[in-house]
Amino acid sequence: PADDYVEKRLDVSEFLIDHHDATFFVNIQGQSMVDVGLLPGDKVVVDRSKTPRMGDIVLAVVDQEFTIKIFDYGANKMPRLMPANSSGAYRPIYIRPDMQFEIFGVVTGSFRRFK
């Protein structure tokens, strides 16, 4: 029967948020992260308490502008922020010493509404 496939009620906050005091939501703008399923209008969950690791999707501030990208290190061991869009329309952001750079939080989830 269909009841066998119904899970318990889901508390969305409990599911999406690990640290309530350090978590907030950001709207996705642009298409630089579509290959990882982040589409314009989606909301991402950002946790400021998590330590960013290579390969994490992060919310970063680069020269006073926010961006969501994949945190990585280039061949020169300098940090870079990688887009996830195979169209070639977006380039990595290579962080130079003269740039203002801060990882503002780690993206831990996302969600969207259909209607």
List where the protein language model places each region:
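Acidic/glycine-rich C-terminal interaction modules and beta/coil loop segments
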Residues: P1-V12, L16-K115
